[in-house]
Amino acid sequence: MSEEGKITRSIHVIPLKRVYWGRRTNRADRAVRLIRKYVRRHFKEAEKIIIDPAVNEYVWSRSREKPPRRVIVEIRFDKEEKTAKVLLIRSSKAKIMSANSK
């Protein structure tokens, strides 16, 4: 975790495998809710959680029924405004693709 004044930055790997336990028809919806729940658990002081559209697009990229198993995000927590912003670092698919190209 790095701190620059009032903003705390941290990188998290959020596992989304629990959304596969339920019905197929709303897995991406539950994945977004799980991300919000994860951030709320780790940043208890956060009153507002903002999920970047890139994170949402990545979760929905393979349709509603097949969200990714995990997502790597950077969470920026502003202590004064008590907001947590969730930003996409990279997809695990991009990490695998770059490893295969070497």
Swiss-Prot record:
Pfam families: Ribosomal_L31e (PF01198). Keywords: Ribonucleoprotein, Ribosomal protein. One of its GO terms (cellular component) is ribosome. GO terms for molecular function: structural constituent of ribosome. One of its GO terms (biological process) is translation. The keyword ATP-binding does not apply. The keyword Phosphoprotein does not apply. It comes from the Archaea. PROSITE patterns: RIBOSOMAL_L31E (PS01144). Belongs to the eukaryotic ribosomal protein eL31 family. This is Large ribosomal subunit protein eL31. It comes from Staphylothermus marinus (strain ATCC 43588 / DSM 3639 / JCM 9404 / F1). The gene is rpl31e.
